[in-house]
Amino acid sequence: AGGSGAAGSGAPGGAGGAAGLWGTGGAGGAGGSSAGGGGAGGAGGAGGWLLGDGGAGGIGGASTVLGGTGGGGGVGGLWGAGGAGGAGGTGLVGGDGGAGGAGGTGGLLAGLIGAGGGHGGTGGVSTNGDGGVGGAGGNAGMLAGPGGAGGAGGDGENLDTGGDGGAGGSAGLLFGSGGAGGAGGFGFLGGDGGAGGNAGLLLSSGGAGGFGGFGTAGGVGGAGGNAGWLGFGGAGGIGGIGGNANGGAGGNGGTGGQLWGSGGAGGEGGAALSVGDTGGAGGVGGSAGLIGTGGNGGNGGTGANAGSPGTGGAGGLLLGQNGLNGLP
């Protein structure tokens, strides 16, 4: 494992060591704390080149200005999964949270045993500032495998903003589902959900969009990932709840496979809890390709004023029905 940066120095954490023929890569060290800016977490080491998972990235250092970025996950070996990204550093006394690290890329053949990209790191939380952005999920290996999920955005406090969720990683070329988008963080303004990753070409689904974060005004749900040639579009994320303002809009559904497959459903709009406010609009359903059903539109969010419903996606050009419109 990589060493941690000294407290008060803002120095980055050390990188994890690479494994040999097989074995897991070493974890990255934590970044050092600092008033002027937290140090970045160290990168995870590469997994053994034949069989081994990448190491996890280190946590970013805390700071009263900006928490350090989490370290990226290590690359998986030939048959190994990518390592998880490190969490972003905490923002203290008005400082903002650091961004989460990206998940590592999966190995070339890892998808054949179900391994894929690493999970993105969570964005750093803040005690009186904006939350950090979640890290992107790692992409799967070149041939096959699932993409890693995006990290959730960090929570912000008081009159600040929750971090946006990280995007899901893309699947391998031939088959594998896209990674789910990370949820938006809580805040005065809720963070937006991350987009779902795109699927492989054959019989795979796009990743679901992340939920919008809860806040005075809700965050927008993430868009669903798109399918390849054969497969289904990912569902759009649900919009965040608005505690004292409007709810967030639902994310749009991903498109279905170009040759065959249904579009993803649009996400439901977030509810608005206070008097006089409006629920979020429902997301639009994803369209199908040549053959398939369009995704249903998302329902509008509840509230004193109902959110507008999303429209259903178009059916296949050769064969397929349009998706149903959402309800108010």
Walk through the language-model features, giving the residues of each.
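Long, compositionally biased tandem-repeat segments
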Residues: 1-328
